[in-house]
C-alpha cells in the first residue's frame, strides 16, 4: 500500500513539472495538427464532398468510435483485465461525451461549412481561453490572476494576427456559421473543465475511451440520420481513419491525464 502511494506521488510530481507539461501538451498539439491534412485526404478517398456535412459527421463518428475502442483496449492491456466501463465511469463519461465529442464536433462541422477559414480559425482559437475563464469564474477550480488574463489576451491576439496575415475579415455573423463554431468552442471549454474535475475521481484513460466510444456512436447515428454515408471505402481510407483514431486516442487521453494533475490554465 505504501509502495503504491509512493508511486502515485512520484507520478504526480512528474506530471506537474512545467517542462513535462509543456512537452506533453506540445506533443498533443502536434498530433492534432497532423490530423487536419489527413482528414481532407480521407474525405477525398472516401468521396465525402466538402459541403456534405452529414457524411463528414459520419466520418468523425467512425473515427471517434474506433478511438474509444483503442483506448479501452490499451487500458485493458495495461491493467491486465478487460476494462468494461461501470456505472461510476458512465456517470462521468456521459456529460463529457455530450460536451466534447457530440456537442463540439457536431456544431464545429456544420459551422465550418458555413463560414470562412479566417473567421473559423479565429473563433476556434477562443477554445482554450474560454476553458480557462470557465474554470476560474464559473466552476471556481482555480483563481483568476493578472498573468492568466494577460496570457489569454496575448494568446488570442496571436491567433487573430496569424489568421489575418494575407487575408481579409468581413464582419458578417451567421448562427449556422460563426455561431455554431462559437457553440463548439463553448462545448470544448465545458468539456475541458469537466475532464479536469472527473479525471481526479476516475481513471482518465478509461473515462477518455468511454466518452469517445459513446460520442462516436451518437455522431455516427446523427450523421446517418441526416443522410450521410461513406461512399467509397478503400484500404487507404481505412488506414487514414485508423491513424486519425490513434491520434485522438493518444492525444486526448494524454490531455486528460495532464488535466487530472494540473490546473486548466497550466495545460
Per-range role (PLM):
Residues 121-124, 140-161, 171-177, 234-239:
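Loop-to-transmembrane alpha-helix entry segments
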Residues 58-61, 65, 69, 99-100, ...:
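Specific alpha-helical transmembrane segments that line the substrate/conduction pathway
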Residues 31-52, 66, 105-115, 123, ...:
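Juxtamembrane C-cap of transmembrane helices in multi-pass membrane transport proteins
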Residues 2-61, 170-197, 217, 221, ...:
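Glycine-/small-residue-enriched transmembrane alpha-helix faces in small-molecule transporters
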Residues 71, 75, 133-134, 146-166, ...:
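Hydrophobic transmembrane alpha-helices of multi-pass small-molecule transport proteins
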Residues 42, 59, 111, 137-140, ...:
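Hydrophobic/aromatic residues within transmembrane alpha-helices
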Residues 76-120, 124, 161, 244-264:
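Specific transmembrane alpha-helical segments of multi-pass solute transporters/efflux pumps
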Residues 45, 49-101, 130-134, 187-191, ...:
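Transmembrane alpha-helices of multi-pass small-molecule transport proteins
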